[in-house]
A protein has these predicted regions:
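SAM-dependent transferase fold signal centered on methyltransferase-like domains
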Residues: 1-213
Length: 213
């Protein structure tokens, strides 16, 4: 529930000269504040805050995403862009910042950075080059396997890693259960990403790239 109540806040956005109302990032704010700009703010990869900017403080677009501590910000209408999908993954996979996803600006950001969707229903993106933006975390793709933990285990036995980071968005898995099943060895850490690729479930074996954005 909103506190103060929603009606009070809506009236404030219509009558005050300008200002901002801080609300929870998980709030149901869609279509609740017409004529305002809603900013989603993330800190260290976690969406922490949403602010409804109104009057003289509002920007020209409906949504804004800001990532901290980088300070990069993007403001646009979420419906102004639509990112193409690709039948196969490229050299890199990108995990978008939660502020971009929550604000609905994923396609806008992807289009501006020449990124493609792995699937129309999947937030993971791909490209052959790493963009200069703080809105994504980059991973170098080593292999793309079918959505089979058995196949994944067989692949990793050839050169098992010291540690595995397991990630997913649209494919529901129990990361800890999967991690415990994977063979360990002396190779550098890997990231195991369960994702939809061109309409099918897949497992992407990758390496996290630090300092790419």
């Amino acid at each position: 529930l909103y506190q103060p109540n929603l009606e009070w806040m809506q009236k404030l956005t219509r009558t005050a000269t300008g200002g901002g109302i801080k609300i929870g990032p998980a709030s149901n704010f869609l279509q609740k504040f017409p004529g305002c700009e809603i900013e989603l703010i993330s800190l260290h990869g976690e969406c922490r805050e949403a602010t409804v900017w109104f009057g003289s403080m509002a920007g020209p677009h409906t949504f804004r995403a800001t990532v901290l501590p980088a300070g990069e910000s993007l403001s646009e209408d979420p419906l102004s862009a639509w990112t193409n999908t690709t039948p196969t993954s490229c050299a890199y996979l990108f995990d978008p910042d939660p502020a971009i996803v929550r604000s609905g600006l994923l396609d806008v950001m992807a289009e501006r950075n020449n990124l493609l969707r792995l699937d129309a229903e999947e937030e993971y993106l791909t490209a052959d080059q790493i963009p200069t933006t703080a809105f994504v975390t980059a991973f170098k793709i080593e292999a793309v396997l079918s959505n089979s933990v058995k196949e994944l285990k067989h692949y990793l036995r050839q050169s098992p890693s010291q540690h595995y980071e397991v990630k997913c968005r649209r494919i529901s898995i129990e990361a800890d259960v999967v991690r415990r099943q994977l063979p360990t060895g002396a190779e550098p850490p890997r990231v195991i990403i369960f994702a939809k690729v061109a309409g099918r479930g897949a497992i992407v074996v990758a390496h996290r790239i630090t300092g790419a954005s």
